[in-house]
Design a protein with these regions (language model features):
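Detector for C-terminal structural segments
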Residues: 1, 37-47, 64-193
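Structural transition elements
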Residues: 1-13, 33-40
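Short, well-structured beta-strand/strand-turn elements
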Residues: 8-14, 50-66
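Short helix/loop segment immediately N-terminal to the Walker
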Residues: 10-24
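Short, well-ordered beta-strand elements
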Residues: 24-34, 56-59, 78-81
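Envelope-exposed proteins and targeting segments
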Residues: 25, 52-54, 153
Length: 193
């Protein structure tokens, strides 16, 4: 609240923050209509932001419109809420590199839906894709994570837990931490009695 007060956003009689021009601090949060989990998250966020004096409007669309038009063509004014998954070491080029911002010129290709641009991140993503030395990759990933945490191009809400069911006779298999099973470290697998 103090940061908003200092920035000139004071609460009116209804508890909504207004700037000096009398404009409310208001934005939309969008997701797919009918997705109960996301709709509940929207309601919680709306309630929490209201306590801070921010007017959040919930605006949802059918999935075919939300993903087929709104998200890919970047037609949301503030926040679009959806989930995505990736492997633990997938380089997030399509979501973070400025070359992957969907535009009319590239026929809406890429998944950098927020329009995030950072030349340092671009260079880092390009190096990570080709670096094979494990120690060097670790340093690069730490740099990437620090830039991400500073710039916050997307706001992760939570990580989904995925069940990983293994047969009792199989040993040495390490769950991947994401929904896709993998044959990584297959040399460690063994059939046991």
């Amino acid at each position: 609240n103090a940061i908003l007060d200092e920035a000139g956003w004071s609460k009116n009689v209804k508890g909504i923050r207004m700037n000096s021009a009398g404009e409310p601090l208001r934005f939309d949060i969008m997701t797919t209509a009918g997705n109960r989990t996301r709709e509940l998250v929207q309601q919680v966020l709306q309630s929490q932001w209201k306590a801070a004096g921010i007017d959040i409007r919930i605006k949802n669309e059918p999935a075919r419109i939300f993903f087929g038009e709104t998200v890919i063509k970047r037609k949301f004014d503030a926040m679009a809420m959806f989930a995505w998954i990736s492997a633990p070491e997938s380089v997030p080029r399509t979501t973070l590199h400025s070359d992957d911002i969907p535009t009319t010129e590239n026929n809406w290709a890429g998944q950098n839906y927020t329009g995030y641009r950072n030349p340092e991140m671009n260079a880092l993503l390009e190096v990570i894709e080709t670096e094979l030395d494990r120690d060097k990759r670790e340093v690069l990933w730490h740099k990437l994570q620090n830039i991400y945490a500073t710039d916050l191009p997307a706001l992760p809400l939570y990580f989904r837990a995925n069940a990983f069911i293994l047969p009792k006779w199989l040993s040495g298999l390490t769950p991947t931490g994401h929904q896709f099973p993998t044959t990584l470290w297959v040399e460690d697998w063994a059939a046991t009695n």
